[in-house]
């Protein structure tokens, strides 16, 4: 080819396509090299072989399988191949959103335990320590981190020569001007792999941006316009389409569930319409009239119009999203449900689903709407978990775990925070309270339930306000999704128009007028009850009946939407749900809509003129001047008397106290239910806990008298009540009495190495076995004490040696260990006192935390003295002797000489 052609054309492969691998990778090979805990499906094994081929051809690539088909496990299998077959020790860098970081870590541990994986997270100080460790010890295979930390510590990560750079949820890179895109282009990587369930969302430009990451030499930044211009008319030019297929074939693999996961249960989407309450209608009109200037010049007022659209969407969700609308004293009641047509429908929908034994993922765009839904869940007594953008990684993981392991009815999620990477197949019903402008976000959210591992049919229910902007937003999203499906199909890039459709030129000011004719036809509520069974279909034994389609979906207020990839999806939209009475509302507002809007505007202007001529000036033209509110004099805020203020204060206090009491009762009920479930689980596994009961220590607190007077008494006691000795605490210097050895552990259930951990393992096989089993059975909480004998290998002639493991440290999911938590240590010492008192035993401790920088030994010593020594328990603190080391007396115990 001529040298003047763009680089991507110079690298165009031959007509016959890429040469196949001489030797295919088989699953037994991967198992031999270290793959465990999974049986790859045939299409996943094909994907692994395709990735291997790309690696050998030195092509970066995009694995664009639909959400839920196992892109993570295919990537891990590739890394296993590189290490096991090619002896490529990496390092490999994996970038992903924070929301799926724990999932990546768990699947690395599960599928590739032979690969060492470092999770690079934490605050600045923690990451600095990790950087030092990684520089000193480079023997890791995989470094796992998030986009945000990659940007913060780009200079450190650039210092490595990565064998593989893998980016999960890679549609984050669709803009080649973004900081992350520019940063990753500076990384040194032999092979670049992008994972995304949505390889193209809007345009050829976005696709080129991804190609620019995987093969920057072929798809250079400067030639994006050449790419767009060459292929923008591929729908008309079959030669260009064929050329584009060949160009993309080495770089892009895309499979959808309908093609490869035929055993996956069916997914059906149903659109259910709802009316509006009178309160919602009132505010809907008021929002439209708040800023009339915005409708005069759309180009200049686009931001204002977008704000109006957002406010209208909030109004359709719930009027309480606006300050000052909810009536005082802010007590949850039926008014919360009746104020919103959407929540009125959702209330009946959830009751229907609950009685049928279904479990629900409930998505909303707005976290404030999730707040209202959370109040509603508490009011109705439904069990739920919640995840949104404010929920930290550890809490997010716990919520997902709880939903998977417990019969929780609803999982509340924000679409963008909860729509990425989560596996929530315990749910069989997905409800979208409102729709995203980008349909790919909704698709990803629905894929949390409809994915590999789901064994039930999935029903996706979308709630849309009738005759509101929600209708036109959803229609535009559906059109956008149809365009995307034309662009990429069956693993190839296929002909599809990339020019904006007619709707893209649709004026925003026109969107806001949609449906006004019918919406404003009456002032009253348009909410009504509908037959949910006829709309949603049959349900039996907690499962949707896959073969029974709803009989009255379209007629009864609902509309069936086809599953992605089905034949229905490619049909004409001529009979779409937006075609009412022969008029296509998806194209533009009707004449009646425009007429109703003009009437509103004229009325608003008349009211403004009357108010102005009446001698009053408006401080804010955005005042809510609508029929029913503007008639008569403007109502002033009532000035309350001191008695009325006091009465209101008391009512608010009573309401707050009642809410607090109800929340406490529900919390206790939930804890009791969880405890009963855990006891049943333990019994089914034959597990017996070694934890000391906390009831006796709580009783001891009640009987212990005045703490302050006790503290004063301790000051007068001789410090020799603690015996300081030199020796090995695992072989206590005891007489004929029982001896309790104390050791502090964390709540992870992973036994440590070195120091006292190793010494205890030499002494007995029980500590590691009992501690790790307690971790597996979720029997390790801060403040717990595991007490058990350790005389299995050696014993004294008289008296028994026991080990008390105090859970006093927390290890988070990124393997960061906290310091010793004094409250947990104190709780543990209380329990040890009662056990030692009953057994008439002595207590033997190492110098807890002596190697920890900044550890409060003085406070620890006081706790030991307070709860053990001064209460009659023989207490010994051991200093381990080391060669050529002289043991000096601790400053806090100057009168206690050490035994040499």
UniProtKB/Swiss-Prot annotation:
One of its GO terms (molecular function) is nucleosome binding. Residues 620-678 are annotated as: Required for ATPase activity. Residues 653-673 have a biased composition (Basic and acidic residues). One of its GO terms (biological process) is DNA repair. Residues 546-569, 641-673 are annotated as: Disordered. Residues 345-507 form the Helicase C-terminal domain. Keywords: ATP-binding, Chromosome, Coiled coil, DNA damage, DNA repair, Hydrolase, Nucleotide-binding, Nucleus, Phosphoprotein. The modification Phosphoserine is found at residues 534, 612, 623, 641, 894. ATP binds at residues 65-72. One of its GO terms (cellular component) is site of double-strand break. Residues 709-900 form the Macro domain. It catalyses: ATP + H2O = ADP + phosphate + H(+). Its EC number is 3.6.4.-. InterPro entries: ALC1, Helicase_ATP-bd, Helicase_C-like, Macro_dom, Macro_dom-like, P-loop_NTPase, SNF2-like_sf, SNF2/RAD54-like_C. Belongs to the SNF2/RAD54 helicase family. The macro domain mediates non-covalent poly(ADP-ribose)-binding and recruitment to DNA damage sites. Mediates auto-inhibition of ATPase activity by interacting with the N-terminal ATPase module, encompassing the helicase ATP-binding domain and helicase C-terminal domain. Binding to poly-ADP-ribosylated histones upon DNA damage releases the auto-inhibition by the macro domain and trigger ATPase activity. Does not bind monomeric ADP-ribose and mono-ADP-ribose fails to release the auto-inhibition of the ATPase module by the macro domain. ATP-dependent chromatin remodeler that mediates chromatin-remodeling following DNA damage. Recruited to DNA damage sites through interaction with poly-ADP-ribose: specifically recognizes and binds histones that are poly-ADP-ribosylated on serine residues in response to DNA damage. Poly-ADP-ribose-binding activates the ATP-dependent chromatin remodeler activity, thereby regulating chromatin during DNA repair. Catalyzes nucleosome sliding away from DNA breaks in an ATP-dependent manner. Chromatin remodeling activity promotes PARP2 removal from chromatin. Interacts with nucleosomes; interacts with the acidic patch of histones. Interacts (via macro domain) with PARP1; interacts only when PARP1 is poly-ADP-ribosylated (PARylated). Interacts with CIAO1. This is Chromodomain-helicase-DNA-binding protein 1-like. The gene is Chd1l.
């Amino acid at each position: 080819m001529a040298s003047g052609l763009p680089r991507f054309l110079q690298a165009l492969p031959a007509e016959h396509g890429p040469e196949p691998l001489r030797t295919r990778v088989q699953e037994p090979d991967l198992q031999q090299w270290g793959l465990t805990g999974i049986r790859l499906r045939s299409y996943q094994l094909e994907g692994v072989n395709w990735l291997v081929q790309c690696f050998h051809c030195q092509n970066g690539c995009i694995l664009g399988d639909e959400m839920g088909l196992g892109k993570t496990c295919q990537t891990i299998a590739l890394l296993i191949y590189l290490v096991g077959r090619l002896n490529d020790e990496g390092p490999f860098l994996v970038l992903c959103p924070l929301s799926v970081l724990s999932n990546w870590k768990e699947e690395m541990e599960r599928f590739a335990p032979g690969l060492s994986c470092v999770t690079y997270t934490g605050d600045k100080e923690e990451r600095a320590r990790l950087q030092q460790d990684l520089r000193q010890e480079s023997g890791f295979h995989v470094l796992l981190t998030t986009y945000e930390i990659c940007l913060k510590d780009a200079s450190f990560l650039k210092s490595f020569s990565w064998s593989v750079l893998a980016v999960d949820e890679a549609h984050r890179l669709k803009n080649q001007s973004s900081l992350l895109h520019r940063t990753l282009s500076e990384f040194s990587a032999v092979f670049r792999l992008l994972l995304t369930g949505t390889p193209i969302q809007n345009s050829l430009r976005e696709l080129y941006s991804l190609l620019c990451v995987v093969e920057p030499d072929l798809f250079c930044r400067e030639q994006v316009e050449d790419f767009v211009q060459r292929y923008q008319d591929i729908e008309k030019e079959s030669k260009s389409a064929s050329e584009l297929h060949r160009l993309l074939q080495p770089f892009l693999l895309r499979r959808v569930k309908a093609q490869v996961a035929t055993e996956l249960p069916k997914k059906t989407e149903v659109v259910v319409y709802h009316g509006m309450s009178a309160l919602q209608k009132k505010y809907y009109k008021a929002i439209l009239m708040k800023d009339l200037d915005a409708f005069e010049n759309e180009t200049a007022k686009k931001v204002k119009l977008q704000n109006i659209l957002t406010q209208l969407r909030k109004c359709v969700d719930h009027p309480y999203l606006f300050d000052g609308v909810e009536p005082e004293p802010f007590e949850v009641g039926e008014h919360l449900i009746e104020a919103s047509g959407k929540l009125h429908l959702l209330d009946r929908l959830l009751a229907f689903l609950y009685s049928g034994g279904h479990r629900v993922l409930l998505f909303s765009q707005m976290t404030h709407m999730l707040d209202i839904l959370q109040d509603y869940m508490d009011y109705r007594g439904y069990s739920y978990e919640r995840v949104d953008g404010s929920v930290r990684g550890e809490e997010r993981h716990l919520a997902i775990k709880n939903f998977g392991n417990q019969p929780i009815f609803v999982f509340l999620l924000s679409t963008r925070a909860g729509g990425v990477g989560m596996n929530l197949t315990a749910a069989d019903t997905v409800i979208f309270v409102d729709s995203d402008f980008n349909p790919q976000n909704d698709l990803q959210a629905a894929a949390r339930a409809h994915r590999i591992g789901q064994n039930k049919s999935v029903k996706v229910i979308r709630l849309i306000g009738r005759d509101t902007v929600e209708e036109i937003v959803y229609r535009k999203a559906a059109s956008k999704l149809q365009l995307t499906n034309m662009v990429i199909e069956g693993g190839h890039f296929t002909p599809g128009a990339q020019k904006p459709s007619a709707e893209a030129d649709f004026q925003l000011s026109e969107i806001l007028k949609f449906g006004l004719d019918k919406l404003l036809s009456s002032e009253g509520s348009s909410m009504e009850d509908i037959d949910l069974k006829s709309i949603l279909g049959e349900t039996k034994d907690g499962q949707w009946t896959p073969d029974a389609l709803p009989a009255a979906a379209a007629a009864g207020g609902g509309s069936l939407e086809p599953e992605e990839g089905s034949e229905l999806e490619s049909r004409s939209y001529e009979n779409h749900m937006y075609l009412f009475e022969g008029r296509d509302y998806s194209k533009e507002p009707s004449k009646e809509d425009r007429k109703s809007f003009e009437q509103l505007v004229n009325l608003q202007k008349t009211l403004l003129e009357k108010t102005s001529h009446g001698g009053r000036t408006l401080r804010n033209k955005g005042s809510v001047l609508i029929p029913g509110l503007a008639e008569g004099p403007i109502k002033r805020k009532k000035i309350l008397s001191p008695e009325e203020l006091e009465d209101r204060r008391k009512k608010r206090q009573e309401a707050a106290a009642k809410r607090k009491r109800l929340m406490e009762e529900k919390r206790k009920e939930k804890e009791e239910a969880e405890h009963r479930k855990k006891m049943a689980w333990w019994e089914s596994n034959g597990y017996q806990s070694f934890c000391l009961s906390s009831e006796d220590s709580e009783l001891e607190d009640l009987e212990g008298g005045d703490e302050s007077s006790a503290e004063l008494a301790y000051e007068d006691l001789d410090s020799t009540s603690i015996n300081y000795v030199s020796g090995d605490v695992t072989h206590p210097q005891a007489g004929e009495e029982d001896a309790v050895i104390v050791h502090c552990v964390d709540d992870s259930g992973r036994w440590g190495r070195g120091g006292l951990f190793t010494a205890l393992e030499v002494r007995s096989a029980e500590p590691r076995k009992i501690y790790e089993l307690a971790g597996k059975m979720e029997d390790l909480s801060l403040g717990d004490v595991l007490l058990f004998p350790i005389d299995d290998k050696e014993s004294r002639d008289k008296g028994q040696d026991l080990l008390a493991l105090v859970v006093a440290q927390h290890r988070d999911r990124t393997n960061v260990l906290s310091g010793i938590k004094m409250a947990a240590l104190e709780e543990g010492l209380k329990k040890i006192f009662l056990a030692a008192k009953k057994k008439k035993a002595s207590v033997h401790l190492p110098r807890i935390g002596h190697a920890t920088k900044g550890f409060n030994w003085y406070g620890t010593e006081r706790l030991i003295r307070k709860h053990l020594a001064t209460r009659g328990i023989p207490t010994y603190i051991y200093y381990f002797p080391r060669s050529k080391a002289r043991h000096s007396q601790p400053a806090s115990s100057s009168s206690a000489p050490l035994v040499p």
